[in-house]
Amino acid sequence: MRIGLLGGSFNPPHQAHRAISLFALKRLQLDRVWWLVTPGNPLKDNGGLHALAERAAAARKVAADPRIEISCLESVIGTRYTADTIDYLRRRASRLRFVWIMGADNLAQFHRWQKWQHIAAQVPIAVVDRPPRSFRALNAPAARALARYRVAEADASRLADRAAPAWVYLTGLKMSLSSTGLRNPDGSWKSF
């Protein structure tokens, strides 16, 4: 089984998360996408972060597709770092083929993630374009360091079968929604 992993705060979850997941299911020929709702992002201020259970419940409503599963795994296993989560999943579910899914905005700062090289060495990565962030993302330190492992977009459907490091930059999905844009100044969620 081929599983896409989409990690995030989901504060709040929104239609772009769903659109990215459906896009990845199709373009990467995945069987499922798991939304890994994090207890807290180590690179962000978590002061306005809603309760994990509230974010997971909202994510289930937004996902609205049986191929998208919502998980609070990081809370269960007691980690907040993607590298540790991926190591755990690879040990516990070695028969599954995982692909890490991220937006171009995350590729632009991927070099700041704990053990980012380890993540890239453990699972293939699919980066979904988020204009106008394309240029910055593709010229970021991690993108430059991993340039020789980039897979042609035409071969994206076979990414899950490739040994890491391997990554693809997917274009064609145009969604400008962001969780930041859906939060009020006090941290409450706007209607969506």
UniProtKB/Swiss-Prot annotation:
Substrates-to-products reaction catalysed: nicotinate beta-D-ribonucleotide + ATP + H(+) = deamido-NAD(+) + diphosphate
Pathway: Cofactor biosynthesis; NAD(+) biosynthesis; deamido-NAD(+) from nicotinate D-ribonucleotide: step 1/1
TM helices/strands, residue ranges: none
Swiss-Prot/TrEMBL GO biological process terms: NAD biosynthetic process
EC number: 2.7.7.18
Gene3D superfamilies: HUPs
Entries under InterPro entries matching the protein: Cyt_trans-like (IPR004821), NadD/NMNAT (IPR005248), Rossmann-like_a/b/a_fold (IPR014729)
Molecular-function annotations in GO: ATP binding; nicotinate-nucleotide adenylyltransferase activity
Protein origin, superkingdom: Bacteria
Keywords: ATP-binding, NAD, Nucleotide-binding, Nucleotidyltransferase, Pyridine nucleotide biosynthesis, Transferase
Protein task: Catalyzes the reversible adenylation of nicotinate mononucleotide (NaMN) to nicotinic acid adenine dinucleotide (NaAD).
Entry's family note: Belongs to the NadD family.
Protein name listed in UniProt: Probable nicotinate-nucleotide adenylyltransferase
Organism whose genome encodes this protein: Bradyrhizobium sp. (strain ORS 278)
Encoding gene, per UniProt annotation: nadD
